[in-house]
Regions:
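Nucleotide-activated donor-binding/catalytic signature segment of Leloir-type glycosyltransferases, i.e.
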Residues: 212-224
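General small-molecule cofactor/ligand-binding pocket signal
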Residues: 33-35, 81-85, 132, 181-183, ...
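Small/aliphatic-rich secondary-structure junction motif
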Residues: 1-51, 146-195, 220
Length: 285
């Protein structure tokens, strides 16, 4: 293990995943390999000519390889393995290859600073290894790693996911020299808050008392433990912005089949707002 799968899409990405990924690989003591994806359609009569299609494919892959190898050379990383893949669907090859060949972290830059594209969501939904999505946003320039966990769950699968998020968050914070912050959201709809039917402060104090032992096990300072109330997607976004979190770590329960394609889970609602570099820790249902 200790292998990092770096996806290079330099011409379209919002930030340089290769440079950031290789720097992070050194911090995490992982062996990085770079994967570049390319694919193109031929139009008209040319699309039915296998020989011409093969020539075009080879030319595109060679061009991509030369560009990336030159970039690796500028980073003093000429020895880092480079693979150029001809694939229509990036996520299918990346998820399968990473799992089969023992990679334990996948790194990719997002295309836009303010939202993910379908390929990013497909990776989130299908990856079996942790996925780090990088952005270059001025909101994430703080020295903070924020993790989100569900302290109130009694579901064994969610509890295991909590532990995985904590472990990866600690490892990332230590490697990057950032301060670890932990967030737990008591989900209370805004309409209930507006009706003033609940004593919010009492609920927060009760949560701190109930989860005192787990908080102590995590080992963060008191001012780095945040129990907040509201809708997770909004609360966590606001907290990450306030902390200027460089990294945000969240667990994602992956849904397969039609249900997973139609109904986004809480993690996806959170990620649709987040502006930090996001580390997604997957789990199977």
């Amino acid at each position: 293990m200790n292998k990092m799968f770096v996806i290079a899409q330099m011409e379209r990405a919002h930030t340089d995943a290769v440079a950031h990924g290789l720097a992070l690989a050194k911090q995490l003591n992982k062996q990085a390999e770079v994967f570049a994806y390319t694919y193109a359609y031929l139009s008209g009569a040319d699309r039915d000519n296998p020989r011409l299609a093969g020539v075009a494919q080879k030319a595109l892959m060679t061009q991509q390889e030369k560009q990336l190898q030159a970039h690796l050379d500028t980073l003093d990383a000429e020895d880092v393995p480079l693979h150029v893949i001809w694939s229509k669907y990036l996520f299918e090859h990346a998820c399968s290859h990473a799992q089969r060949h023992g990679f334990d972290l996948m790194v990719k830059a997002v295309h836009h600073a303010d939202h993910y594209l379908p390929t990013d969501w497909q990776l989130i939904r299908h990856t079996s290894v942790p996925l780090l999505l990088l952005t270059n946003n001025p909101l994430n320039n703080g020295q903070t790693t924020l993790i989100s966990i569900d302290l109130g769950t009694r579901n064994p699968a969610k509890q295991r996911l909590n532990d995985a998020v904590i472990a990866h968050g600690k490892q990332l914070a230590k490697a990057t020299g950032t301060k670890l912050h932990v967030a737990y959201v008591l989900r209370i709809p805004q309409i209930v808050r507006d009706m003033d039917l609940l004593d919010i402060n009492a609920l927060v104090k009760k949560a701190y008392a109930e989860h005192k032992q787990k908080i102590a096990e995590i080992g963060v300072d008191a001012d780095c433990m945040h129990i907040i109330t509201g809708e997770p997607e909004l609360c966590l976004f606001e907290l990450a912005c306030r902390l200027k979190s460089q990294y945000f770590v969240v667990g994602a329960r992956q849904r397969q089949g039609l249900l997973g394609r139609i109904i986004g889970n809480t993690a996806e609602e959170i990620l649709s707002r987040m502006r930090s570099n996001v580390l997604v820790i997957p789990t199977e249902e």
